[in-house]
């Protein structure tokens, strides 16, 4: 892998490779000194044209745990706000010696454009482009699911896929780059995916995606699921009314207290509840569901650092087929 731009074209080998490397990286977070020397002397630039808290901080933590130098670039207050183009910004970063660029952009396809040009000779990681994709979010979601699925089945997670796992993704699919990346990646890993949303919040052409589509959340739950992922209603991307009211939306497509009890009533004791964040509590998910023992919300945040460490390591350390660095040995080098 030279870049990480999309999950649609990510092979099963590469997907499992990232997840397995993330397993190695997660051990770093359990140590007293949470650092490896793997990317010492490398420079990672977080190039964010959209506001972000979780993703930017997660990438920064990941890069620093690998001993890379990190430059955080926000469009607000920069030359971009004065009209500087993506090309000029990229060439400026190239002149500064950037080895990797983590880019979030409001325009779908911007990371692909950056990777396809000669503006900068650096690894490009898509941290979210418009409503298109968010590959590292999908990878950390898959990492979280794989750990849970392996625990349920009593198997090792390393080297495993998600064959047979039933995943429902509900909410604002139309504006969700997370949904798109998850559908492609989960299909590659062998999971069965069902999208649940009102017709107004489903994109044109969704019938051609490798998943099922439902308009009824209760029917989807009754059919049986192993993971329930709720998506945030992205009001900032809406310029029209996509549903009658927030109350009606919550009643029909939100994961409320009643649906939380339904999992128990249906005997689905191992079903987990996921959310990529940030959450609209009381709209797409109730506080009881978000804070329940079934919730993996905080685990997803924690796993995100490990997955992003893996992505940076595989892109910048040379041969992506090499094994992850020996954590115990590297511990001695950094102490």
UniProtKB/Swiss-Prot annotation:
Function in brief: Catalyzes the condensation of carbamoyl phosphate and aspartate to form carbamoyl aspartate and inorganic phosphate, the committed step in the de novo pyrimidine nucleotide biosynthesis pathway.
HAMAP family for the chain: Asp_carb_tr (MF_00001)
Catalytic activity: carbamoyl phosphate + L-aspartate = N-carbamoyl-L-aspartate + phosphate + H(+)
Identification of the protein by name: Aspartate carbamoyltransferase catalytic subunit
EC number(s) per entry: 2.1.3.2
InterPro entries from the UniProt entry: Asp/Orn_carbamoyltranf_P-bd, Asp/Orn_carbamoylTrfase, Asp/Orn_carbamoylTrfase_sf, Asp_carbamoyltransf, Asp_carbamoyltransf_Asp/Orn-bd
Gene: pyrB
Keywords: Pyrimidine biosynthesis, Transferase
């Amino acid at each position: 892998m030279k870049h990480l731009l999309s999950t649609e074209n990510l092979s099963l080998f590469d997907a499992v490779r990232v997840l397995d490397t993330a397993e190695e990286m997660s051990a770093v977070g359990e140590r007293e000194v949470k650092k490896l020397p793997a990317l010492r002397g490398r420079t990672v630039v977080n190039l964010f044209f959209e506001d972000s808290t979780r993703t930017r901080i997660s990438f920064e933590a990941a890069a620093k745990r690998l001993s890379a130098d990190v430059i955080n670039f926000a469009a607000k207050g920069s030359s971009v706000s004065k009209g500087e183009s993506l090309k000029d910004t990229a060439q400026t970063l190239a002149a500064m010696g950037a080895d990797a660029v983590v880019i979030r952009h409001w325009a779908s396809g911007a990371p692909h454009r950056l990777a396809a040009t000669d503006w900068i000779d650096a690894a490009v990681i898509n941290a979210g482009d418009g409503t298109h994709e968010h590959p590292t979010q999908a990878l950390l979601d898959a990492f979280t699911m794989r750990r849970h699925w392996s625990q349920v089945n009593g198997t090792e997670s390393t080297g495993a896929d998600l064959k047979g796992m039933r995943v429902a993704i509900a909410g604002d699919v139309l504006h969700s780059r997370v949904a798109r990346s998850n559908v492609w990646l989960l299909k590659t890993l062998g999971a069965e995916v069902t999208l649940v949303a009102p017709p107004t919040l489903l994109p044109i052409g969704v019938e051609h995606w490798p998943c099922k589509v439902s308009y009824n959340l209760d029917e989807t739950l009754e059919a049986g699921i192993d993971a329930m992922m709720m998506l945030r209603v992205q009001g900032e991307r809406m310029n029209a009314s996509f549903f009658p009211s927030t109350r009606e939306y919550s009643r029909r497509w939100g994961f409320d207290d009643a649906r939380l009890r339904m999992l128990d009533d249906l005997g689905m004791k191992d079903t987990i509840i996921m959310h990529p964040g940030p959450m609209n509590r009381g709209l797409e998910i109730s506080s009881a569901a978000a804070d329940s023992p079934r919730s993996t919300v905080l685990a997803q945040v924690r796993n995100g650092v490990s997955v992003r460490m893996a992505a940076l390591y595989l892109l910048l350390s040379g041969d992506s087929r090499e094994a992850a660095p020996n954590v115990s040995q590297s511990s001695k080098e950094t102490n």
